[in-house]
């Protein structure tokens, strides 16, 4: 009795996209690419959200505000990133806070991906699809979002400044074609 209840509880707590991957996407990719082993099938590894704050040189509090917004979007605490070395042209000193980042894995990664594809991307102004050439050659995909207010967690009235952000989707795919097939299966809206 207890085992049946715990199994049912874990099934309901599993993110929707993770269930879709385990039930349909994995089998489809295995047939498409002819993998012998289940572990060869590409899967999502992590999603990194990065927010660079250019105004950090004038006001050192801006990166911490960006980190708070990023934490709301991601659902976990963001880390303030610091400059590795000084660049006089940008008025940046070594170890100065210049942005924020979050690395999402496991359940939070799937939950964020669901919100990104189904809620945030359709809310982007003049959105015509994602660039299908933004793969890095090793099965990872990077994209930029110009306004972080497209996420439902951000209250537009309380935002004092709009920042852009990078979203990097890392996969275990060996080639860009495998990664493209994986992300298309997750309903990424690539341009034709």
Swiss-Prot record:
Pfam families recorded: Ribosomal_L5, Ribosomal_L5_C
Ribosomal protein as a keyword of this entry, yes or no, is: yes
The UniProt keywords, alphabetically, are:
Ribonucleoprotein, Ribosomal protein, RNA-binding, rRNA-binding, tRNA-binding
Intrachain S-S bonds? none
Tell me which family the UniProt entry assigns to this protein.
Answer: Belongs to the universal ribosomal protein uL5 family.
Q: How does it assemble?
A: Part of the 50S ribosomal subunit; part of the 5S rRNA/L5/L18/L25 subcomplex. Contacts the 5S rRNA and the P site tRNA. Forms a bridge to the 30S subunit in the 70S ribosome.
Kindly give the HAMAP family that the UniProt entry links to this protein: Ribosomal_uL5_B
Q: What is this protein called?
A: Large ribosomal subunit protein uL5
Q: Which gene encodes it?
A: rplE
């Amino acid at each position: 009795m207890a085992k049946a209840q715990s199994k049912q509880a874990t099934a309901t707590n599993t993110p929707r996209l993770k269930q879709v991957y385990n039930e349909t996407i994995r089998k489809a990719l295995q047939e498409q690419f002819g993998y012998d082993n289940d572990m060869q099938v590409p899967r999502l590894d992590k999603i990194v959200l990065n927010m660079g704050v250019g105004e950090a040189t004038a006001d050192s509090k801006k990166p911490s505000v960006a980190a708070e917004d990023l934490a709301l979007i991601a659902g976990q605490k963001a880390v303030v990133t610091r400059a590795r070395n000084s660049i006089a042209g940008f008025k940046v000193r070594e170890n100065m806070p210049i942005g924020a980042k979050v690395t999402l894995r496991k359940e939070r990664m799937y939950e964020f991906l669901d919100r990104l594809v189904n809620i945030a991307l359709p809310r982007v102004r003049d959105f015509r699809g994602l660039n299908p050439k933004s793969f890095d050659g090793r099965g990872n995909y990077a994209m930029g979002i110009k306004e972080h207010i497209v996420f439902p967690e951000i209250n537009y009235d309380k935002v004092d400044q709009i920042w852009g952000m990078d979203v990097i989707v890392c996969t275990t795919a060996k080639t860009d074609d495998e990664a493209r097939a994986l992300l298309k299966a997750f309903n990424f809206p690539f341009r034709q």
